[in-house]
Regions:
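N-terminal beta-strand motif that seeds the catalytic metal site of vicinal oxygen chelate
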Residues: 1-20, 46-47, 64-69, 116-126
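Vicinal oxygen chelate
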Residues: 5-13, 56-126
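A generic "binding-loop/recognition-motif" signal
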Residues: 15, 37, 46, 74, ...
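Short linear motifs in intrinsically disordered
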Residues: 27-32, 70, 91-94
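N-terminal first-folded block
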Residues: 7-43
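Conserved short beta-strand elements that form part of the metal-binding/catalytic scaffold
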Residues: 28-62, 111-117
């Protein structure tokens, strides 16, 4: 498929802390790869990386890109986020005919969305 997202990167201050967070929240695994502090993200057909931020993060809120992860149970993810040290920044919001969405900050102050899509919405997209 042309023009689709093929690879993404999560920039972090503390790689060990961030890896522990994403393992706990989404069950992703990480493979040490390439330069020091650079990890490939594995899980559910993902192609991504997690690595040390090259410069300090400034500001708050959305910083350019937003990634939303499709999940089976957005309430369970919200609980895992808090347990793993993240902060839910927008509680569950229902988007009619689409699904339920939360936003959270990970342990590295990155803003992430998690959404449980309605079955009818998913079926219409396939």
């Amino acid at each position: 498929m042309p023009n689709h997202v093929k690879f993404f990167s999560i920039m972090v201050d503390d790689t060990a802390r961030a890896i522990a967070f994403y393992e706990a929240v989404f069950g992703w695994t990480f493979e040490d790869w390439g330069p020091p502090g650079f990890y490939l993200i594995r899980g559910a057909g993902l192609e991504g990386s997690l690595h040390k931020r090259q410069e300090p993060l400034t500001g708050t809120g959305f910083r350019a890109f937003e990634i939303t992860v499709g999940v089976d149970d957005v309430d369970a993810i919200a609980a895992r986020v808090v347990k793993a040290g993240g902060v839910v920044t927008m509680p569950k919001m229902r988007i009619e005919t689409v699904g339920s969405l939360i936003y959270f900050n990970d342990t590295e102050a990155n803003r992430v969305g998690a959404m449980t899509y309605d079955a009818a919405y998913e079926a219409a997209r396939t």
